[in-house]
């Protein structure tokens, strides 16, 4: 049995990191979160632009906030509310605690003494949580506890040949050992619906796959017009890609060859599902990563051909570069990428050898090795899938 050393949480789930998160219940409290970060080095501040005045989308934000804060990579949460926003911060905190069992401390500026008092109390509580987190010890757990999130961004013509198949190799390995893999970016599955539906575990799952991809294609055409299939990002074109369909055939390689067990809406909790699962979500990288983490991914793997350096604040994100030119242009072995998948082309490495290299690297990361985005502090912010970010 394959095992790794993780942090077992009160609800039985396992984290690969041990963070104390400080987050605003609505974006009007972001400044307070930043003050707490300055007072208490070691906490992870989560900055966002949500929490109020988003009619029709608030249920999604509430789900994401609770999902993110319940991820087992977090030891404890400091939640700061203003008081006049749509949801009560203390009620949200109680929900997070019920789901995760983790320590949660919530304060409301308009009820708990104003900004300075809340900053002081939250800072004191954050220090206690950091001390508690420092007492946690990693324990040996089976790989079946892993939820592995996959992502690609800034793709080029080699992404579907080198980096994405390497992630697919890792995905198949995780599934074979009882774990869970998340494949997303539905806009980048357009044209592959029959391929993916053919891998579905049941006719019902196949129908879900076709539905989400066809719905996404209609949305893309609404925004981009009848030539939508030819419109891809400028960087993708510069990297040698030509159409959404070509890009999609490379994108889905991140899911390997395993049977697709289910389809989830954006950021919905994984709730014990095993095997390969599609999460409905956009191609926009920070939004996609937020959804993967909310669903339950403790570790992420992100391929790039053009050299996107983005990570995620609360999860290790292994950056795999599809080509050696970009890898060395961005610093090489001491630069912005974790793994050079271009070695398949320039060094004669076989695809399976690259895949095993990625497996070995991921195992080190699960056991505590920092990824490049973690070392460089390139976590980014929370971004949520909404009507304003449809693709």
What residues fall within each predicted segment?
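Metallocofactor- and cofactor-centric catalytic cores in central/energy metabolism, strongly enriched
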Residues: 1-391
């Amino acid at each position: 049995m394959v095992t790794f050393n993780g942090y077992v949480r009160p609800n039985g789930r396992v984290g690969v990191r041990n963070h104390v998160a400080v987050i605003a219940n609505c974006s009007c409290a972001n400044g307070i979160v930043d003050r707490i970060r300055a007072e208490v080095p070691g906490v992870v501040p989560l900055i966002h632009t949500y929490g109020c005045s988003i009619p029709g989308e608030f249920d999604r934000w509430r789900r994401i906030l609770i999902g993110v804060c319940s991820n087992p990579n977090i030891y404890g949460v400091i939640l700061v509310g203003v008081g006049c926003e749509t949801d009560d911060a203390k009620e949200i905190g109680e929900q997070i605690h019920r789901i995760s069992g983790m320590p949660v401390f919530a304060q409301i500026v308009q009820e708990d003494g104003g900004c300075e008092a809340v900053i002081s109390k939250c800072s004191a509580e954050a220090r206690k949580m950091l001390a508690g987190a420092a007492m946690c010890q990693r324990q040996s757990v089976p790989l079946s506890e892993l939820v592995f999130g996959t992502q690609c961004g800034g793709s080029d013509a080699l992404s579907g040949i080198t980096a994405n198949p390497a992630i697919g190799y890792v995905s198949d390995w995780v599934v074979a050992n009882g774990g869970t893999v998340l494949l997303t970016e539905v806009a980048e599955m357009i044209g592959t619906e029959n391929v993916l539906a053919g891998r579905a575990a049941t006719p019902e799952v196949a129908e879900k796959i076709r539905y989400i991809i066809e719905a996404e294609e209609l949305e893309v055409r609404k925004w981009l017009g009848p030539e939508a299939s030819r419109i891809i990002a400028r960087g993708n074109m510069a990297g040698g890609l030509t159409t959404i369909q070509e890009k999609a055939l490379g994108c889905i390689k991140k899911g390997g060859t395993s049977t697709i067990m289910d389809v989830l809406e954006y950021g919905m909790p994984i709730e014990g599902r095993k095997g390969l699962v599609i999460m409905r979500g956009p191609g926009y990288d920070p939004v996609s990563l937020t959804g993967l983490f909310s669903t339950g991914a403790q570790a992420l793997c992100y391929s790039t051909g053009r050299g996107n350096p983005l990570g995620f604040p609360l999860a290790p994100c292994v950056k795999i570069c599809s080509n050696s030119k970009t890898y060395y242009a961005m610093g090489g072995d001491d630069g912005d990428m974790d793994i050079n998948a271009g070695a398949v082309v320039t060094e004669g490495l076989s695809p399976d050898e690259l895949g095993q290299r990625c497996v070995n690297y991921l195992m080190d990361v699960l056991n505590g090795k920092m990824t490049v985005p973690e070392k460089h502090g390139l976590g980014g912010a929370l971004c949520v899938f909404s009507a304003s970010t449809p693709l």
